[in-house]
Amino acid sequence: MPYVLQANRSVIEAPLASLAHHLEVGSTYEDFLAWVLALRDEVGIPHRLTEAISETVDVPAIARAAILDPSAATNPIQFKAMDYERVLRAAMSGVVDSAAI
């Protein structure tokens, strides 16, 4: 989730700052993201996707499939295949900032 948030940041930053305020976890996008990262740790979700899967991942194929997925239409930003690749590679490496579009 943090990687998708970062990729959509340009569109969702203000609403998530408001949500952070209502959740009483801060008042900025960064505060909300920090809360998500802490929650992820609390429930035991690995930081890197590669910690959760053992098989080789065909990143370009997954990115192409993501474009065709009906739920892609609900994303705040309409991603291209290269955007999905960036998000997936960020999730695999655990570097949230590298998901930025």
Language model features with spans:
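Mobile late-domain/C-terminal helix-loop "cap" segments
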Residues: 2-101
